[in-house]
Amino acid sequence: MTRFIHDRFAKEYLSEMLSPIGTVNIGRDVTSEVREIDVYFTPGTAIPEYSSSLGLLGKMAGTTAIFEPFRNPASASEICSCLGKLLDVRGDKERKFRRENTRSDDEQLPKLWILVPTASKALIDSFNAKPDTENWMQGIY
């Protein structure tokens, strides 16, 4: 359940922008406990020109992804909660691969995108986040 207008707007905006290039689930439950993923995206048929027009969001949507948008700077606790959701989903997928006796690689597992307007250096350092300037622009960790 979305409590704030920004949360609803962010979820609906991401859904509208990503739906032409894949499947978007708003408010997907995580089974370990009742926690909700804001936006779970699975790429569909590629539309390169549309993805390109989305810029950075289009690049992020190149793989299965969890999007967790925040209106204000996220706290360490909120980031840990997002990481917990990612680990739960990855665990579910890995168990499914084992049950089906199929091989998995990191490309089949979702990526986590925590979207915040700002993050302090102390917060970034506390998670040992490092920029990947070869693949992403400044500000992406």
What function would you assign to each model-found segment?
Residues M1-Y141:
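Elongated, amphipathic alpha-helical interaction scaffolds
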